[in-house]
Amino acid sequence: MASLDSLVIFLFSTLFVTIVSSETPCPNFKSIISFGDSIADTGNLVGLSDRNQLPVTAFPPYGETFFHHPTGRSCDGRIIMDFIAEFVGLPYVPPYFGSKNRNFDKGVNFAVAGATALKSSFLKKRGIQPHTNVSLGVQLKSFKKSLPNLCGSPSDCRDMIGNALILMGEIGGNDYNFPFFNRKPVKEVEELVPFVIASISSTITELIGMGGKTFLVPGEFPIGCSVVYLTLYKTSNKDEYDPSTGCLKWLNKFGEYHSEKLKVELNRLRKLYPHVNIIYADYYNSLLRIFKEPAKFGFMERPFPACCGIGGPYNFNFTRKCGSVGVKSCKDPSKYVGWDGVHMTEAAYKWIADGILNGPYANPPFDRSCLRSEIKKESLYNQSTLTQACVKL
């Protein structure tokens, strides 16, 4: 009987791919606290910008698919964090900067497009010019300053942070993008990786000290598949490309390098803080599977041009980007993986989010028992639909 019980438990956990260690906390998340860059920005860069110098994300066709107007998201619609919010039954997370009379009871977002993990002064000393001074450290300081308004007393704030799902990015991508855009040697950019990882780790550690119990920490994307890099580093040497994806192999190897170093550091933190649930989100492989089998996920075949752009083999031009006058989007963004040459479409982000939330691209997997019953039913229905129909959710 004991062996039969064990088998049943094993099969149950395998079917739903959601069981985490019994030592980890299992809250019904009451809010989402977010840090990061454009992958998670829901309007902060727009909020921080001069009204006469707004970023392209403040203009159509950004936001056309779901919100039907620009929201400051670097996407045609929802981003990964929006699908995470839906999954845990919370509202979309509002941006903190530039917000007036916003309700942050269910979440607050400090992610800013262009943000780096490292201080701007650190990068400038190395000849790297970031587009914003709002680094991860600045975001954390802003969060601390906001606490009296968000939660009141220290004990209330500790409870709030402890009951939140804390999303750590993606962050660090811009620390690498800026030097790569200037064609810095890969070995030189690799030297930044330990510093980027240390910045992410120290921020997590500080938030744990403030009461944080559940963290979702994404790795790097397969940047060799990004339209901006395929355009910038276009070459006639076919050996530079992965024949299974059409992506630049050396850039993808760099993305893997960052992600592997991050996973090592997260394992170290787990040993130091066994009461904290630190979930690694494998953005790399959750997206790479789409490039390997685009038709399976409802996307057009290679060469994976940007939906919104103009010119060149990938529909991308550095001087006339999406959101600029005269630059239009494609008729059906759901058939495209890439949105504007740098970021993905809502359709691609939904698949990435599904890979994280429903498996197998989160370690440890999300614990479905943490979700309210109505959310569980909806997620299971969506997962079943996705598996049976194999169409875009």
Swiss-Prot record:
UniProt superkingdom: Eukaryota
Signal peptide: which range, if any?
1-22
Checking Gene3D superfamilies in the record gives: SGNH hydrolase
| Catalytic residues, chain numbering | 38 (nucleophile), 340, 343
A Pfam family (short name) is Lipase_GDSL
The answer to whether UniProt assigns keyword Secreted to this entry is yes
State the SUPFAM superfamilies in the record.
SGNH hydrolase
The glycosylation sites annotated in the UniProt record are 133, 317, 382
Localisation:
Secreted
One cellular component term (GO) for this entry is: extracellular region
- Transmembrane spans: none
One Gene Ontology BP term is:
lipid catabolic process
Alphabetical UniProt keywords:
Glycoprotein, Hydrolase, Lipid degradation, Lipid metabolism, Secreted, Signal
Q: Which GO terms describe its molecular function?
A: hydrolase activity, acting on ester bonds
EC number from the UniProt entry:
3.1.1.-
Similarity remark: Belongs to the 'GDSL' lipolytic enzyme family.
Entries under PANTHER family matching the protein: SINAPINE ESTERASE (PTHR22835:SF678), ZINC FINGER FYVE DOMAIN CONTAINING PROTEIN (PTHR22835)
Q: What is this protein called?
A: GDSL esterase/lipase At1g28600
- What species does this protein belong to? Arabidopsis thaliana
Taxonomic classification: Eukaryota, Viridiplantae, Streptophyta, Embryophyta, Tracheophyta
